[in-house]
Amino acid sequence: MKKISVLLPICAALALSGCFMSQKSQIVRREVPYNAQNQARLRIYGQYGRDVVRMIPNSTCEQWAEKQGRRHTRFTGGPPRRIRNLSVGMPATQRSNTVNADTGVVFRESYKEFVVPAGKALVLDGAFSTETTSQVNRCRTAASLTPQPGKDYEVQYSRSGEGCDVAVVEILPQAEGDLHPTGPAPIQYCPMPATSY
């Protein structure tokens, strides 16, 4: 009887935590002034609300390499938490709808949207690190984007057997129903500093 009274609260807590994590991500809408004449918007995807791609505004590859390029370690992991997708009102895409509806426990994407100055270069610094007692996996890459006035972009970090990538697509204005298609956006990859992993 003692074992049951001890195990019952533990089992109940585990069951409730599973219900909590199976919920869809919350969309938090932020009121941010936006002028399509001289600004652009970015939706940057991450994991479990954590930034896998860091945006460095008003920066070229050269400026980034001097300051930010050397110090960047990002370990992802830890216990799952409530996921919030931060929106400034960008149009929906197939990817954003999929992320909004995701209820994954082991792996779940999230995003944050930003209003940025148009015509000024920024650097998208993507990194992912995992560490166990037997191995360390790290991959880092960076790319420069000069957002154009009134344009919307999506940014995603991806990994494969050959390395990693920061992919940038433009959200096209012609909607297909409620969803907007995307197309490739021009970026320039930054050389990695020698002191970076």
Locations of the language-model features?
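Active-site nucleophile-His-acid catalytic modules used for acyl/amide transfer and hydrolysis
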Residues: E154
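Short loop/turn and low-complexity linker motifs enriched in small/turn-promoting residues
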Residues: C19-R138, S144, Y157-Y197
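Short, acidic, Ser/Thr-enriched surface-loop or helix-capping motifs
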Residues: P147
